[in-house]
């Protein structure tokens, strides 16, 4: 469904396009937040950073990213993006595969108590510091 926005503990995403074969999202990561270290069984992803700075980790290897950086995340690769800056980090994510549900997430590590689940929980960024998820 295009135009759908979801809040997450680390920020938010908006679905820009969702059609058979691919899905496109705009993802905004709040300062000092990061996504789960996760992998997907049924999709690959391509990220293009449009604003901010941060760090991407893929299968244990980290690299800095900033506006203009492009990153390929192969299907099954463990990955995360972190915003260590003081402004939002925004990137466009293009998913390619045969299934794009939010339940195709295996969380390996998560700052918000969701590791080991595919459950997308929306909560405030304060949950990371208070221990609530």
Residue ranges and their predicted role:
Residues 42-55, 59-60:
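Glycine- and acidic-residue-biased ligand/ion/polar-headgroup-sensing regions
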Residues 35, 61-63, 104:
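Short beta-strand segments
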Residues 16-19, 26, 50-53, 72, ...:
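A structural signal for the main folded, soluble domain(s) of proteins
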Residues 36-38, 56-57, 73, 79-93:
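Short beta-strand His + acidic residue motifs that chelate non-heme Fe in jelly-roll/DSBH
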Residues 31-33, 42-43, 61, 77-78, ...:
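A generic "binding-loop/recognition-motif" signal
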Residues 2-39, 43-44:
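A short glycine-rich, His/Asp/Glu-containing loop-to-beta-strand
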Residues 1-8, 80-133:
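Double-stranded beta-helix
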Residues 60-78:
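Short acidic-glycine-tyrosine-enriched beta hairpin
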């Amino acid at each position: 469904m295009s135009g759908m926005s979801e809040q997450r503990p680390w920020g938010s995403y908006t679905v820009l396009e969702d059609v058979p074969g691919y899905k496109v999202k705009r993802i905004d990561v709040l300062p000092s937040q990061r996504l789960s270290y996760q992998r997907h069984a049924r999709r690959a992803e391509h990220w293009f950073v449009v604003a901010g700075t941060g760090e991407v980790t893929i299968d244990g290897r980290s690299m800095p990213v900033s506006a203009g950086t492009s990153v390929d995340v192969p299907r099954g690769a463990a990955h995360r993006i972190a915003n260590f800056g003081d402004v939002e980090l925004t990137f466009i994510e293009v998913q390619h595969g045969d299934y794009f549900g939010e339940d195709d997430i295996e969380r390996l590590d998560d700052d918000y108590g969701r590791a080991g689940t595919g459950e997308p929980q929306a909560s405030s960024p304060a949950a990371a510091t208070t221990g609530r998820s």
